[in-house]
């Protein structure tokens, strides 16, 4: 199985992932990610694990991320930081989630230059 890096989204100078991107990468559903977040909400810190985007900032984001249909009609949006993606991997606790998280850290969150073409990874499955 090949993993393709998600579309790069940056908010306030921080690379983030949408709930849909995390779910797709970790091989689960968006609903499972949302459930785990609400179930463990006390462990997530706004600004550290996730960023809430609303108002004019969200409108600007929608204009720059035209491929992200998952939040086209959202009034507010939670975007997950590297540390938030870690908490989701911990909640899921699957081999795939851990493998993908490690890959995202190396090639998505900490990548310094823009990629000209998608980067893919072979997974064990």
Language model region names:
Residues 1-123:
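An anion-engaging/catalytic patch
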